[in-house]
Structures are given as structure tokens and as C-alpha cells.
Amino acid sequence: PERKITRSKDNILYELDGEPALGLYKKYLGDHVQDLPTQCFYFPLYYQTKDMKKGIVRTILGVDEKTGSMTFAGDLEEGSTARLMKTNIDNLVSGAEDAAKACLSAGASSPGLAIIMSCVGRKIIMKQRVEEEIEVVEEIFGPQTHLTGFYSYGEIAPSKNTLDPTIHLHNQTISITTFAEI
């Protein structure tokens, strides 16, 4: 369910719906709670401010048992909404496909070059299947598009499929920039 960020400072989340954030995560994760923060990439936070048309994902960087707080890879504004997430590989591959299709619908139908920036968190989760996200992008663009890219620790881009030009720092996403001759 959607929750309200009731207490935060910069990138530290103290409370969701008036409850300690870490306690709520522990209830949500059950047996997986011992895996935090080492398995943090599997349990990110979907975050959206009042000004955003579409939310973004925030990765857990650490937890503080003493304060019941959690540190994320990006600021979290009080009064915003949040949703606890669980990642799976098929959704990551599907997200890469959606990103490639969004590029084509936003510009040239046959770009000559695509630069792919994929979060290192995606690589950690996907392990041996990491090539699947590149294969699906290659399939969407076709052989005329040369692909290059790198793994990053944060992707700066507008939110997908929106006309909102505002850029945000994203975590655990794939961002694609294409170039075409006109």
C-alpha cells in the first residue's frame, strides 16, 4: 500500500505513516530482514512527491537499528508518498524493453547509436541473466543501431513515458539516450 513519509531528513527515512521505517520494512520483509542491507537492491522504495507526475525508485544504502531509520541513495521529502517494492528479474527485463520502446516513440524510428546506462543494482540482481536486458534493447532497436553503455550508481533522466521535462536522480533503472542523423 501507499504510505506517507512522516519523518525524513535528506536521504534518511525515519518514519512512514508515523511508524519507524525500519520496523515497517521488517514487518514487510519477514524472513528476508536478516538480509538487509546486503540484499537492499531487492527491496527498493518507490517514491513520489506532489510535484512529480511519476515516481522514482530509491535504493537502500544502510539501516540504523538504534534509530529505526534507513538511509537511501537520494533524498526523501517529508509529506511525499512511498511504496515498498520487491524486485524480480523478469520485471527488470521488461523495464529495459519499455525504455527502448519509449525511446523509439519519442524520436527517430531508427537511431544510429544508443547509449545505455544501467544501474549496477540491476546487474547485481540479474547476475548471469544481466545480458537479457541488453538483448531485449538490441531486439527493439534492430541491427542498424550501435549499442554502447556502462553500469552506473544513479541515472539522471526524466521519468519514462511522461511529457514532464523535469529530471531526477533515479536508482535501479535503465536509461537510454539515442542519436540519429537528421
What spans do the regions from the language model cover?
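Small-residue-enriched flexible segments
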Residues: 1-127, 131-142, 150-182
